[in-house]
A protein has these predicted regions:
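A cross-family signal for key residues in well-ordered alpha-helices
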Residues: 22, 49, 64, 111, ...
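DNA-binding alpha-helical recognition surfaces that contact promoter or target DNA
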Residues: 75
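Charged, amphipathic alpha-helical coiled-coil/dimerization segments
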Residues: 56, 78-135
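N-terminal helix-turn-helix DNA-binding core of bacterial DNA-binding proteins
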Residues: 26-72, 153
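N-terminal leader segment of winged-helix/HTH proteins
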Residues: 1-39, 131, 144-147, 153
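Extended, non-catalytic scaffold segments that flank or surround catalytic motifs
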Residues: 15-30, 62-63, 98, 102, ...
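Alpha-helical linker/hinge and terminal dimerization helices associated
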Residues: 24, 28-31, 66, 109, ...
Length: 153
């Protein structure tokens, strides 16, 4: 998928952070589809990783860990469950909570896709100071989140 739209933006768009971030995400999503998996999405991969890292964690807690809202998380979990990658079990004593478990197939997919993700990230960040770059991106996320939550600009 060509995400470039034919030309590079000029003038004010090149200096508009929201536009640049959207373009970066478009390019990342296109690279993910081509080099990682055309069906499994980044958010789905994040949920699989969290389910693997935190066995028997509930769906709401994973949503918070991977920064997904409740309705998106419910859709992601339904899709993963439909593909046999996770199973959801009602928590004992609390019928509203769903515990997530990675299935054997989910574990296999996580291993395979995880290797592709690692290679993609190595290629994307080749030559860059990866740690400094990710620190800066995470700092921007925190700052922009605080602005979205009502902090003064």
């Amino acid at each position: 998928m060509d995400t470039r739209g034919g030309t590079r933006p000029s003038g004010p768009l090149r200096g508009a952070p929201g536009h640049v971030v959207r373009r970066l995400h478009q390019a990342y999503a296109a690279a993910w589809t081509r080099h990682v998996d055309p069906v499994l999405t980044g958010p789905q991969f994040a949920v699989l990783m969290a389910a693997d890292d935190f066995p028997e964690i509930d769906q709401g807690s994973i949503a918070a860990r991977v920064a997904l809202d409740r309705s998106t998380m419910a859709d992601v979990c339904r899709r993963l469950e439909d593909r046999g990658l996770i199973r959801r079990v009602t928590a004992p004593g609390d019928g509203r909570r769903k515990l997530l478990y990675l299935t054997e197939h989910g574990s296999e997919v996580l291993t395979t896709v995880g290797e592709r993700v690692r290679r993609l990230h190595e290629e994307m960040l080749a030559g860059d100071d990866t740690n400094a770059f990710l620190e800066r991106l995470n700092g921007l996320v925190e700052r922009w989140d605080s602005l979205a939550d009502g902090a003064s600009a």
